[in-house]
Amino acid sequence: MQNHKNELQRSMKSRHLFMIALGGVIGTGLFLGSGFTISQAGPLGAIAAYIIGGFLMYLVMLCLGELAVAMPVAGSFQAYATKFLGQSTGFMIGWLYWFSWANTVGLELTSAGILMQRWLPSVPIWIWCLVFGIVIFLINALSVRSFAEMEFWFSSIKVAAIILFIVIGGAAVFGLIDFKGGQETPFLSNFMTDRGLFPNGVLAVMFTLVMVNFSFQGTELVGIAAGESESPEKTLPKSIRNVIWRTLFFFVLAMFVLVAILPYKTAGVIESPFVAVLDQIGIPFSADIMNFVILTAILSVANSGLYAASRMMWSLSSNQMGPSFLTRLTKKGVPMNALLITLGISGCSLLTSVMAAETVYLWCISISGMVTVVAWMSICASQFFFRRRFLAEGGNVNDLEFRTPLYPLVPILGFCLYGCVLISLIFIPDQRIGLYCGVPIIIFCYAYYHLSIKKRINHETIEKKQTEAQ
């Protein structure tokens, strides 16, 4: 059962890499979380929030591109933080990110259970969570190739569905398709509310950015998958550039259709706004079909999240920052122990299905969103120090296969803007839980590293691995 070389296998192709990155984004944050963003920021504010969030994501991906092409390792930005920001920071970033995805996997499973209530309301949500949890475990447990192939088709389905939703919804907005019950065509009337363009004020747009960041969580998966991809120096640049623009295209156009049809006061997180929109249009069975597509999308993100978390846990442990038994691989190169423990911890997030579903769901998203912001800040900082060291050691920028443009402006701007997003959590009562939980965890990680990990770690071994990755 064990892979004696203890190495991950490079068996992902270019198409897998691109669809994993794109597919990792399109899930709960868009299909369910967008309802919260609309209700808080208003119609125009929701679109603005996704454009701003997309711009921030663009800055981070430009930084990640340079790092991932120069050092294509499974630990991705955790390895970069360890090398360029310090081992204690790398330890904190890695375990925080692992926790975020473990939490997200549980959220996705809960969301899948919520969607199943449309068809089988008598079956408890936790039953569906268990069933779907077993499914994604089996997909991940077979091999990295089986995971990549399944994720490719998962992602293809939801990308096709988003395009179809935009076409059908756009036609309804402009009167080309009639609404159910003879409702009037809204055109752009829903953009102007009884309280103006921004019903809750301009600041409300900024306050929704944590939720929006949660929606964009997953674009960084391309960096983690680079450690198991063929010819990353060729496939990564193309995948990163494509995923940036296509993600923005899908998110912004989908949000336009949602806010044009759905009054902002009716949006929430218990029912998908996508399903609500298709119900209003009244196309036979379209809402059920969309419900199935959203279910597929959510399981896709859970699948990708389990992959990302297990690889991060394996990377941490292989660098002596976690228990050694987590480094064991199967013959197919799957970190089985890390996979099992991650799925087990994800079960804690199933609390969202049995207690105060809407409140706990938003709390979990806030925590994951906060972790995403911290991780992305570390990517910007790592790229800044990587380029500076690269030049100091006599490197030529033209030798880099992927270059972050406008250095050092891009990493500095990305770091500072995400810092502002973190500070904004202080002013949002519903999302302060992200700080209340996140800050103590960060402090604990640093303290645990210095008190326990630092004295037993072999720094030369870690440095050797990082040097070999370059």
Swiss-Prot record:
<dbReference type="GO" id="GO:0005886">
    <property type="term" value="C:plasma membrane"/>
</dbReference>
<feature type="transmembrane region" description="Helical">
    <location>
        <begin position="243"/>
        <end position="263"/>
    </location>
</feature>
<comment type="function">
    <text>Putative transport protein involved in arginine degradative pathway. Probably transports arginine or ornithine.</text>
</comment>
<comment type="similarity">
    <text>Belongs to the amino acid-polyamine-organocation (APC) superfamily.</text>
</comment>
<feature type="transmembrane region" description="Helical">
    <location>
        <begin position="281"/>
        <end position="301"/>
    </location>
</feature>
<keyword id="KW-0812">Transmembrane</keyword>
<dbReference type="GO" id="GO:0003333">
    <property type="term" value="P:amino acid transmembrane transport"/>
</dbReference>
<dbReference type="InterPro" id="IPR004840">
    <property type="entry name" value="Amino_acid_permease_CS"/>
</dbReference>
<keyword id="KW-0472">Membrane</keyword>
<feature type="transmembrane region" description="Helical">
    <location>
        <begin position="44"/>
        <end position="64"/>
    </location>
</feature>
<dbReference type="Pfam" id="PF00324">
    <property type="entry name" value="AA_permease"/>
</dbReference>
<feature type="transmembrane region" description="Helical">
    <location>
        <begin position="409"/>
        <end position="429"/>
    </location>
</feature>
<feature type="transmembrane region" description="Helical">
    <location>
        <begin position="159"/>
        <end position="179"/>
    </location>
</feature>
<feature type="transmembrane region" description="Helical">
    <location>
        <begin position="433"/>
        <end position="453"/>
    </location>
</feature>
<keyword id="KW-0813">Transport</keyword>
<keyword id="KW-0029">Amino-acid transport</keyword>
<protein>
    <recommendedName>
        <fullName>Amino-acid permease RocC</fullName>
    </recommendedName>
</protein>
<keyword id="KW-1003">Cell membrane</keyword>
<feature type="transmembrane region" description="Helical">
    <location>
        <begin position="18"/>
        <end position="38"/>
    </location>
</feature>
<feature type="transmembrane region" description="Helical">
    <location>
        <begin position="90"/>
        <end position="110"/>
    </location>
</feature>
<feature type="transmembrane region" description="Helical">
    <location>
        <begin position="119"/>
        <end position="139"/>
    </location>
</feature>
<dbReference type="InterPro" id="IPR004841">
    <property type="entry name" value="AA-permease/SLC12A_dom"/>
</dbReference>
<dbReference type="GO" id="GO:0006525">
    <property type="term" value="P:arginine metabolic process"/>
</dbReference>
<dbReference type="GO" id="GO:0016020">
    <property type="term" value="C:membrane"/>
</dbReference>
<feature type="transmembrane region" description="Helical">
    <location>
        <begin position="338"/>
        <end position="358"/>
    </location>
</feature>
<keyword id="KW-0056">Arginine metabolism</keyword>
<dbReference type="GO" id="GO:0015171">
    <property type="term" value="F:amino acid transmembrane transporter activity"/>
</dbReference>
<keyword id="KW-1133">Transmembrane helix</keyword>
<feature type="transmembrane region" description="Helical">
    <location>
        <begin position="196"/>
        <end position="216"/>
    </location>
</feature>
<feature type="transmembrane region" description="Helical">
    <location>
        <begin position="360"/>
        <end position="380"/>
    </location>
</feature>
